[in-house]
Swiss-Prot record:
Induction: Repressed by brassinolide (BL) treatment. Induced rapidly and transiently in seedlings hooks but fades out of hypocotyls after exposure to light.
One of the Pfam families matching this protein, by short name: p450
Binding site for heme: C415
Similarity section: Belongs to the cytochrome P450 family.
GO cellular component terms given for this protein: membrane
Membrane topology: Single-pass membrane protein
The keyword DNA-binding belongs to this UniProt entry's keyword annotation: no
SUPFAM superfamilies linked to this entry: Cytochrome P450
Native source organism of the sequence: Arabidopsis thaliana
GO MF annotation terms: heme binding; iron ion binding; monooxygenase activity; oxidoreductase activity, acting on paired donors, with incorporation or reduction of molecular oxygen
Protein name: Cytochrome P450 85A1
Cystine pairs: none
Tissue: Mainly expressed in apical shoots, hypocotyls, siliques and roots. Also present in the female gametophyte.
Record note on disruption phenotype: No obvious morphological alteration during vegetative or floral development, but semi-sterile phenotype with several female gametophytes arrested before the first nuclear mitotic division of the haploid functional megaspore.
Length: 465
């Protein structure tokens, strides 16, 4: 009996302490002018609920507090905005005290010169450097020929397979395609070591920044260190060779006639930026496009007809040209609709550099603002039957330029690699739908937050078309 009373007493003390901590943390962020909302626990905030409940957490908070509310996510006090007009203002006004505000784990792992982290003149330098690598001329003469050759050879390897994990295949496809464009003709051991480190880096970028052994954050930092070592060795090897290279790394290292000269650290961060920014969007969009096309035979029929028409006009092994890809109107519509419905990217983060008034509220300096676009993608006022896969809605080009369209970012941070990603996904779909039929094995769980991900893989049975 005595032991029971002690246990009850301890439990009461713990509950009281937890309640006091929650109240104390809430009071810390209760200031005049702040939006409504809850802040959760000290340090951790509401990160656990956010990551576990995902869209349901956001939806419930929106119902309680409206489209502009406060929380504490990934180690920082954060304002969440689901208002399309407010989002447009936030994304277009970087010069007015709003700069990129990505989680500390992402900044630490992707590098201080990463284009998503810098602003002002540094951002213009890194963005200009990237855009020079993916200009229309570069796309036509260098990038697309490499992408086309890679996709054909990569999908050739599936001829003898009956069942594939399309999640695994598209992740490797996206990584290897980007790495081929950055630095071609790499030795296999180098590629394998780089790939292992890169996959660990990706996991670490969305983690609580606690540097302890075994944490995703520590693994991500170690993976980035390994990637830096590999890139240093590769760059030194190229300098020692005296050869001229026409891949992305070659242009980044070029000194003469380079309008955007970068330091070695900036080059390494640029390489990681290119790999990271395209990896998840290209791989996941490719996987989800196949799922939606499988579930909507009419859309698959129209997409396949578009691609078979190109093949009929070409010799058997003739590659796709840039004008071919630009002419794939329905394919582009499928890519946009897949990105919208699957919500490959849930939103973007900004940070205030001074106290700001937004939407009638006073936002303190140093707070992050999460422009959360998932709910906007499903807004019935913006998209008719928003939960239905309907690529035909995008055949009206004007939809891409609407203020409510955040599929590829917006404002001054509109994704600079958007067209490169579309080229890669279009090429993949071209060679897949003209070579294979497929059906889902079934039974695979598909998570949609914080990343679109199948924990045990997403399996397809394929056969020649």
């Amino acid at each position: 009996m005595g032991a029971m009373m002690v246990m009850m007493g301890l439990l009461l003390i713990i509950v009281s302490l937890c309640s006091a901590l929650l109240r104390w943390n809430q009071m810390r962020y209760t200031k005049n002018g702040l939006p409504p909302g809850t802040m959760g626990w000290p340090i951790f905030g509401e990160t656990t609920e956010f990551l576990k409940q995902g869209p349901n957490f956001m939806r419930n908070q929106r119902l309680r507090y409206g489209s502009f509310f406060k929380s504490h996510l990934l180690g920082c006090p954060t304002l969440i905005s689901m208002d399309s007009e407010v989002n447009r203002y936030i994304l277009k006004n970087e010069s007015k005290g709003l700069v990129p505000g990505y989680p500390q784990s992402m900044l630490d792992i992707l590098g201080t010169c990463n284009m998503a982290a810098v602003h002002g003149s540094s951002h213009r330098l890194m963005r200009g450097s990237l855009l020079s690598l993916i200009s229309s001329t570069m796309m036509r003469d260098h990038i697309l020929p490499k992408v086309d050759h890679f996709m054909r050879s990569y999908l050739d390897q599936w001829n003898e397979l009956e069942v594939i994990d399309i999640q695994d295949k598209t992740k490797h496809m996206a990584f290897l395609s980007s790495l081929t464009q950055i630095a071609g003709n790499l030795r296999k051991p180098f590629v394998e070591e780089f790939k292992t480190a890169f996959f660990k880096l990706v996991v670490g970028t969305l983690s609580v920044p606690i540097d302890l052994p075994g944490t995703n954050y520590r693994c991500g930092i170690q993976a980035r260190n390994n990637i830096d070592r590999l890139l240093r060795e590769l760059m030194q090897e190229r300098r020692d060779s005296g050869e001229t290279f026409t891949d992305m790394l070659g242009y980044l290292m070029k000194k003469e006639g380079n309008r955007y000269p970068l330091t070695d650290e900036e080059i390494r961060d640029q390489v990681v930026t290119i790999l990271y920014s395209g990896y998840e969007t290209v791989s996941t969009t490719s996987m989800m496009a196949l799922k939606y096309l499988h579930d909507h035979p009419k859309a698959l029929q129209e997409l396949r007809a578009e691609h078979l028409a190109f093949r009929e006009r070409k010799r058997q092994d003739e590659p796709l040209g840039l004008e071919d890809v630009k002419s794939m109107k329905f394919t582009r519509a499928v890519i946009y609709e897949t990105s919208r419905l699957a919500t490959i990217v849930n939103g973007v983060l900004r940070k205030t550099t001074r106290d700001l008034e937004i939407n009638g509220y006073l936002i303190p300096k140093g707070w992050r603002i999460y422009v959360y676009t998932r709910e906007i993608n499903y807004d019935a006022n913006l998209y008719e039957d928003p939960l239905i896969f309907n690529p035909w809605r995008w055949m009206k080009k004007s939809l891409e330029s609407q203020n409510s369209c955040f599929v590829f970012g917006g404002g001054t941070r509109l994704c600079p690699g958007k067209e490169l990603g579309i080229v890669e996904i279009s090429s993949f779909l071209h060679y897949f739908v003209t070579r294979y039929r497929w059906e889902e094995i079934g039974g695979d769980e598909l998570m949609v937050f914080p990343r679109v991900f199948a924990p045990k893989g997403f399996h397809l049975r394929i056969s020649p078309y």
